[in-house]
Amino acid sequence: MRRLISVVALCALALTTQVLPVTAQALDDPIPRPINKGGPQVRLEPVAIGLTAPNWGISAPGDSNRLFITDQDGILWKIDLASGAKTVFLDVSARLVPLGAFGPGTFDERGLLGLAFHPDYANNGLLYTFTSEPVSGPADFSTMPPGTPANAQSVIAEWQVPNPRTAASVVDPSTRRELLRIDKPQFNHNAGALNFGPDGLLYISLGDGGNADDEGVGHSPQGNAQDPSNVLGDILRIDPAGTNSTNGNYGIPADNPFVGEAGFVPEIWATGFRNPFRFSFDSATGKLWAGDVGQNDIEEVDVVTEGGNFGWRVKEGSFLFDPNGDDPGFVTERSPGEPDGLIDPVAEYDHDEGISVIGGFVYRGDAIPQLRGRYVFGDFARSFEEFGRLFHFRSSGAGQIQEFRLVGQDSLGLKLDGFGQDANGELYVLGNTTGTPFGDTGVVMRIAPRERDNNLEADLNGFAEVDAATGQFGAGDLNGDGLSEIRLRPENERVCFSLRWADIDEPVASHIHSGVVGVNGPIVVDLLSNADNFRHENGEGRANGCAEDVDPELIDDIGNHPGAFYVNIHTSPFPGGAIRGNLERSEVGI
């Protein structure tokens, strides 16, 4: 069913919102009801620090141990979820426009904005990026008048990773292949999300081109978002492996909703958006959820459907919108379901609650059962002077938006830049304290249950020991093995432990060290000297006890990044360590 209304109807709708009767007034408080805190209480666990402005995070198909994070300044990070260690996977910073829309160090919406892995990435190593680049040659799509340069160009590119199943592999920059290039009239409203849908095709979100009210140079008379002859203000659907596009670099699926219709760009899958900066597919239902950033009044969440028109700039959210000539536009009245042919959001809020919606994910993880099936999203900031907010509502119906209750935090304490989702469906909060693509305050935080699972364990063996001189594995007692179980007690500054071992000489020491797999590190907690019970007989034994007066910050660090710490047992024949293993979370406590 063709849901996009005709160009004639769109023009008529635009006229009705520009020439309003004198009784039409701007609404001072479109949605009086506030967003209150409610629902499951959660903790935010730091995973990685020292980024700039992280805005999107996903796992690569077949890789459950890492999260790949786009940083607005041009770095694509590969982050180890156990240790928090980060590696540069791809650096496109040299390709970007100079960031800082109002000068160095200032706010900007351009940069490295999107990432998607090909569904068969584990075999073909293909991935795709969305970047804001300087004008370089003719664009595949442009709304700019002849002789008028664009502010920047939005570029979708394909890259390849050799040996993608190898953990140390990174992107080969020489494999870059450009799919399409789009002129951007202004610096803002880029959108920037990339996702492969359940159908195996690539979906791309584009904003209306920038400026206020979808007006100005590079904007159609009715606004780009209601002009089906250009791609701005739309979500596109393409086949990266195809060749039937005008430039021959990608394919246009034959079942796209507007293929063959005169005056319509055939790449369009849905239209009528202002700035759908983030969208995602629900892994359980396949539905596409998008957060569309509003103008001066309304932020909205949409369930996007094929061929749908989501209203901008005829409407802002479920409210009629008046572009108001040369003055700032405003909403006039709520008009659910009208005009005919426009689709209203499933959730919305006004600017008393936030200024820029950040779309997220429907939670399908296991760690927080009470959150399952809820759409998790947020807002960049309550105001430009305040921090961001985290929201959720039930995805199965007309759920009321609630703000997360955070353990130990009255507020998020960050500008919210985006969300991440790992291979297990667990979600991550991405943000920084500056609200700009500069500095190193960017963080990645896991949304975790209210009560942290403080039970950890490590399987111990001699092969895991690393030679201090050569860095080679196998420096321990290759006949021995063991198990260490750890219970973190931050409330009373204790680390309790149980050690078991077999086929080694009598232990002389045991510790928790700082260090990921394959790396030797310093002692942080002495275990064996704090043992209440110790037994060793015929090469086997056990010990248990609690280390007292341990720094609570260290306990938190171990709990947040168990993979960055290891337990080992020392013997006289192996003073550097007989058996060793890195910590991981355990479902069994001691």
Model region roles, listed by residue range:
Residues 1-8:
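Bacterial N-terminal signal peptides that target proteins for export
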Residues 45-46, 85-94, 167-180, 246-257, ...:
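Beta-propeller fold detector
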